[in-house]
């Protein structure tokens, strides 16, 4: 169990939830007060869901209180297909929006955390995606300090973010999750970070599989723990038991991480008697409630940026009697949700929205025009709902490797 939950723009992979615009859209609002409110709503739903899961005896992945959001990497490289998860290319805007998001997630109780927020991915993790497991980032000292680190520093020193996720890539030859320069000298010693560090999934494996900086899981794990990576998403830390027996690391070294992890659980109120946790009173009825939907709609409206309005086409004239909607995105509900998303109780496509908005005497015609991905068929399935430990059958998949010839 690696404490994995997601809420990049709404509680994700845990059933019905209020879905906000993707992070890049939230940044386009330039409204950190509104984002603080949105994050507070998200954390309300996360708390309500967690306590309902506990009542049902469920404590699996995506059912906890430690959330791997926000993503405060800098969207500098357009080849990074996951740039929409970030707040864009500007370090200052990213700092402001990330700070608001963390404050909304973690709450304002002086003694307890509403959720654990996680600032990720530390550091210089900005695509391309395909080589992230072996890439060596070599920014100048100025670029590192001026571009890639400010948002993390803000979230640590002003937001008291409870967790940081270390990145897959290397920085100046050292895997980030084993970097003394990043995690000890900068994060803990210089900035005063008191929380815990969690690895990205499989990042410790990368030390010896792809970076080739360490020989095996044991040596990689020892290095990661000593550099302050307290929790691993993956399996390499299983080797730490053998490392202790071999004298490569001590139990007290492990206890340093253990204490940080238990402190996070205590701050979440997980050891309090029933009724004493200030956040257990949040009712499940808040999940995807009407007020939350209205707030998400308002954020979506604020996120829209008009780049061009040729011949003052917008707003549309009420004299129009026929509107043509062209393109596959008009009816694609999946693309509306982004990634790391929840499942809304109600979803309206662009075409449906236009047809509902116009008067009955306006004809709306639709033409798909082209496919989004050539002629591939894509059938969306919420697979995360099938990956729960409920004793039921899982997913059956057949894999085909065929050479297709166009005739």
Regions found by a protein language model. Name each.
Residues 405-407:
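Conserved small/polar residues in nucleotide/adenosyl-binding loops
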Residues 1-403:
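Glycoside hydrolase catalytic-domain context in secreted enzymes
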């Amino acid at each position: 169990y690696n404490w994995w939950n997601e809420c990049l723009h709404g509680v994700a992979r845990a059933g019905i939830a209020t879905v906000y615009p993707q992070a890049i859209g939230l940044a386009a609002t330039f409204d950190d007060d509104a984002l603080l409110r949105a994050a507070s709503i998200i954390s309300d739903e996360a708390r309500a869901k967690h306590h309902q899961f506990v009542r049902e005896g469920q404590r699996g992945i995506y059912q906890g209180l430690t959330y791997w959001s926000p993503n405060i990497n800098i969207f500098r490289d357009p080849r990074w297909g996951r740039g929409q998860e970030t707040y864009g290319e500007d370090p200052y805007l990213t700092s402001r929006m990330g700070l608001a998001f963390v404050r909304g997630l973690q709450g304002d109780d002086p003694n307890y955390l509403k959720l654990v927020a996680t600032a990720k991915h530390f550091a210089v993790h900005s695509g391309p995606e395909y080589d992230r497991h072996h890439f060596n980032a070599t920014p100048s000292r100025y670029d590192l300090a001026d571009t890639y680190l400010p948002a993390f520093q803000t979230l640590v020193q002003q937001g008291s973010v409870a967790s940081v996720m270390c990145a897959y890539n290397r920085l100046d030859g050292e895997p980030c999750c084993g970097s003394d320069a990043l995690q000890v000298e900068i994060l803990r010693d210089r900035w005063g970070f008191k929380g815990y560090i969690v690895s990205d999934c499989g990042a410790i494996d990368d030390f010896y599989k792809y970076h080739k900086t360490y020989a095996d899981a044991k040596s990689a794990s020892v290095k990661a723990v000593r550099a302050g990576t307290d929790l691993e998403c993956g399996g390499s830390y299983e080797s730490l038991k053998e490392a202790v027996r071999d004298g490569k690391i001590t139990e007290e070294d492990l206890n340093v991480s253990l204490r940080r992890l238990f402190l996070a659980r205590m701050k979440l109120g997980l050891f309090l008697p029933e009724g004493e946790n200030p956040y257990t009173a949040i009712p499940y009825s808040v999940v995807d409630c009407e007020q939350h939907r209205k707030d998400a709609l308002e954020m979506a409206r604020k996120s829209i940026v008009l780049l061009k309005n040729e011949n003052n086409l917008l707003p549309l004239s009420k004299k129009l009697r026929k509107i043509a909607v062209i393109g596959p995105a008009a009816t694609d509900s999946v693309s509306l949700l982004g990634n790391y998303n929840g499942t809304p109780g109600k979803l309206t496509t662009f075409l449906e929205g236009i047809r509902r908005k116009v008067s009955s005497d306006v004809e709306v015609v639709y033409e798909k025009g082209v496919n989004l991905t050539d002629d591939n068929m894509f059938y969306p399935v919420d697979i995360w709902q099938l990956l729960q430990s409920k004793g039921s059958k899982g997913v059956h998949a057949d894999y085909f490797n065929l050479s297709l010839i166009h005739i």
